[in-house]
Curated annotation (Swiss-Prot):
The gene is argC. It is found in: Cytoplasm. It comes from Synechococcus elongatus (strain ATCC 33912 / PCC 7942 / FACHB-805) (Anacystis nidulans R2). Keywords: Amino-acid biosynthesis, Arginine biosynthesis, Cytoplasm, NADP, Oxidoreductase. GO terms for cellular component: cytoplasm. Pathway: Amino-acid biosynthesis; L-arginine biosynthesis; N(2)-acetyl-L-ornithine from L-glutamate: step 3/4. InterPro entries: AGPR_AS (IPR023013), AGPR_type-1 (IPR000706), NAD(P)-bd_dom_sf (IPR036291), NAGSA_dehydrogenase (IPR050085), Semialdehyde_DH_NAD-bd (IPR000534). This is N-acetyl-gamma-glutamyl-phosphate reductase.
Amino acid sequence: MHESSRLPVGIIGASGYGGVQLVRLLQDHPQLEVAYLGGDRSAGKEFAELYPHLGPHLNLTIEAIDVDRIAERCAAVFLSLPNGLAYDLAPALLERGCKVLDLSADYRFHDLKTYALWYGGDRQDAAVAHTAIYGLPELYRNRIANAQLIGCPGCYPTASLLALAPALKQGLIDPDTIVIDAKSGTSGAGRQAKTNALLAEAGNSVGAYGVARHRHTPEIEQICSDLSGHEVLLQFTPHLMPMVRGIHATIYAKLRDPNLTTEDCLTVYQAFYRNAPMVKVLTHGTYPQTKWAAGTNLCYLGLEVDARTGRIVLLSAIDNLIKGQAGQAIQCLNLMQGWEEGLGLPTLCYYP
């Protein structure tokens, strides 16, 4: 372990967008220090070779993944890997005393049968998976504080669930009427080359993908079911937008009481998130924009009641790489360490 007073952490999967976002954010964290960067195809390369703009701040080489070496040097480890790889590493790291924060889908599900149905894979880690806590601090703050293994939420689920949670928890809506229309920037597809994320394909164009089969659907349904107290099936459709970062979700649901007003619902939301420093509930008539959240760990929420249709319209905006990924993972580690949850996390956007 490091002799530094700061907590040494490692990042496995340091060369992807999630990994580099973690590296950048951790440079500004007063209590955390990057002690290890791990990778597979990038092993042996200087981090500065991959990301020259961060080179002056982090003089580390990406190393081959060695669990014993990681445990010797790190108290906590972020797994920023493709789905299906974390569950081979997390049990060994936990056994060696490391706290583990997994940014993939591997530890997000209560039921591994649901995971297998949507993601595949032969899981042999059911006992370990049972100990994982879903890493959405605004809903599970106390559980996260006492956890050793965190399954960090996906980006679409983060934006969707923060918008839906108060309405579900307080019984404002009929859960079976939920429709989620969400948009994401191209960085959500990762750093590997994909045709639909090329500038010539994504520029000046908007299109849906994963219609009726996107993998984030069961994740959103799982937490909505927990919040409402019964099984929820909902409609979720994501779209790719011609921008680099950001997620915007517009969500529709039928109100149980058609006499509720926008002001009534805003009062519920403001009370629900009164102790949530990373969630900003906007005033009536102001609706979230992705630009406001860019570069921050904030989620902006707005809402409107449509008295004509008896529906509520919920709107949210986050930075998919920060509140939707790396920043939220750090927020969870802050809680696990007993620190203020927003410690070291940005709250001012890039503007314009």
